[in-house]
């Protein structure tokens, strides 16, 4: 049986975290990028992590952050996986004694083709839409057909996903994991419980 894994990113409150977990999210993303409207600090992250039931993965998202600051956060917040969304290379990403996911901003098929070679130590790759000045959370999607024949390293689909289009996205790409942020929000940084539930329910229906 194939299960479509779901990650709800940009969690900012324990309430949103708990709702997403109870709705069936496999992972929750905490954004440690000050420029993001979904950014949180260590104290908020600790409260969110403490509210979660067992077996829900906590993912820390960093964008071009210093190694020193990443280590400080990892020492104080129970993080299971790191997601790097900036210009980091494999040598930087692998130094923190945590599994890591590397976001790839997709413009062409070669971005997808070359990703596994560029990041051989990544647990998985996350394919997101390219934006010239932003590193994610834009609500934009890329050409999903570019992934239809991809069979390399485990990967996650992101970029412009919503409860309404996640089914189509999975059917086109064959994704086994999906990541959403803005597509399930009432406003930036505040999740909409109904959208979260609908997104996860749709992903679960596609599992087989």
UniProtKB/Swiss-Prot annotation:
Pathway note: Amino-acid biosynthesis; L-tryptophan biosynthesis; L-tryptophan from chorismate: step 3/5
Catalyses which reaction(s): N-(5-phospho-beta-D-ribosyl)anthranilate = 1-(2-carboxyphenylamino)-1-deoxy-D-ribulose 5-phosphate
Record keywords: Amino-acid biosynthesis, Aromatic amino acid biosynthesis, Isomerase, Tryptophan biosynthesis
One annotated GO biological process: L-tryptophan biosynthetic process
The EC number(s) this enzyme carries: 5.3.1.24
GO molecular function: phosphoribosylanthranilate isomerase activity
Disulfide bonding pattern of the chain: none
NCBIfam families, A to Z: PRK01222.1-4
HAMAP family in the cross-refs: PRAI
Family: Belongs to the TrpF family.
Protein's name in the database: N-(5'-phosphoribosyl)anthranilate isomerase
UniProt source species: Neisseria gonorrhoeae (strain NCCP11945)
Encoding gene per record: trpF
């Amino acid at each position: 049986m194939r299960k479509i894994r779901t990650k709800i990113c940009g969690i900012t409150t324990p309430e949103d975290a708990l709702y997403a977990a109870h709705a069936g999210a496999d992972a929750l993303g905490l954004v440690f990028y000050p420029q993001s409207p979904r950014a949180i600090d260590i104290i908020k992250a600790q409260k969110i992590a403490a509210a979660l039931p067992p077996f829900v993965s906590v993912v820390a998202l960093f964008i071009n952050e210093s190694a020193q600051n990443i280590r400080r956060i990892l020492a104080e917040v129970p993080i299971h996986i790191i997601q790097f969304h900036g210009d980091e290379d494999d040598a930087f990403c692998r130094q923190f004694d945590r599994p890591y996911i590397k976001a790839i901003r997709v413009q062409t098929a070669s971005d997808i083709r070359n990703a596994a070679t560029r990041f051989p130590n990544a647990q998985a790759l996350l394919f997101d839409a390219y934006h010239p000045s932003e590193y994610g959370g834009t609500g934009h999607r890329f050409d999903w057909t570019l992934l239809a024949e991809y069979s390399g390293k485990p990967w996650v689909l992101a970029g412009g996903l919503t409860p309404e289009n996640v089914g189509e996205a999975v059917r086109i790409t064959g994704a086994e994991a999906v990541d959403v942020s803005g597509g399930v929000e009432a406003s930036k940084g505040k999740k909409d419980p109904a959208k979260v539930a609908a997104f996860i329910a749709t992903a679960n229906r596609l599992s087989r």
